[in-house]
C-alpha cells in the first residue's frame, strides 16, 4: 500500500495546497499526486505539473497524476507530464492515470505523445470500465509504451458497481 499526497482540487485554483502537500509529504506520504487538467488555464495546468515535480524532486518521491481525463482532444497534460519527467530525469518514476482524451487525439499527436511516454519510461493506467473514452491501450503497446489497467472507482458516484476486482476491469 502506498499513500499518495494528492492535489484533489487543483494547485493554482485552491490556495494553500502547497502547504498541505508539504505537510503530507513531511508526514511520510509515498507518492506525489496531481490532477492538472482541472485547472482553469493551460498556464495553470503547466504550473501544476511543475509544482508536483518540484515536490517529487525535493522529497525524492514518485509522481502519479490524473491527466487528460475528459473528452477534449485539446487537453495536453499527459504531454506536459511526460516532458517534465524527461527534463527532470524522472524516468520510470511517473505514472499517468486515465488519459481519456487520448481516444480523440489525432494519430500524429498520439504518436508524438507515445514517443515521449516511451522516452520518459512512463506508464499509463487505463480505467476502461468508468466511461466511454479511455487510453488507447493497443495503440500504446504497438508504439512500445508501458500500459496497465486499474480500477479507479470502488462503490462511488463514478462507478457504483466497483468491487475492487481487477477481473471486472480486464
Region annotations inferred by a language model:
Residues 4-17, 26-135:
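Active-site core of metal-dependent hydrolases
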Residues 62, 83-94, 121, 137-170:
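His/Asp/Glu-enriched, well-ordered alpha-helical/loop segment
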